[in-house]
Amino acid sequence: MIPGELIPAEGTIELNAGRPTVTLTVANTGDRPIQVGSHYHFYEVNPALQFEREQARGMRLDIPAGTAIRFEPGDERVVQLVALGGTRQIYGFRGEVNGAL
């Protein structure tokens, strides 16, 4: 073994297996690009992103950790969100929840 080496288990690894998901159409109505990271509470993203916001409460992008999606001005795209795990308590971001979901 080499220090830092990762040896994954045999077979396919499925990200976020069994977690609830939702698919939303998101439009950037602003005049600047907006980038959203993999673990950002999607409900609290920039208000220039227009979508069914209540459906995104307690959800994040269903993409690999450490990655992001960029929404260019005027862009509209479909994204899949996945439920946040852990204790489901949200603090920070834009300060719209600051507590349990």
Swiss-Prot record:
GO terms for biological process: urea catabolic process. One of its GO terms (molecular function) is urease activity. The keyword Chloroplast does not apply. InterPro entries: Urease_beta-like (IPR002019), Urease_betasu_sf (IPR036461), Urease_subunit (IPR050069). Keywords: Cytoplasm, Hydrolase. Pathway: Nitrogen metabolism; urea degradation; CO(2) and NH(3) from urea (urease route): step 1/1. CDD domains: Urease_beta. The keyword Cytoplasm applies. It is found in: Cytoplasm. Belongs to the urease beta subunit family. NCBIfam families: PRK13203.1 (NF009682), urease_beta (TIGR00192). This is Urease subunit beta. It comes from Thermosynechococcus vestitus (strain NIES-2133 / IAM M-273 / BP-1).
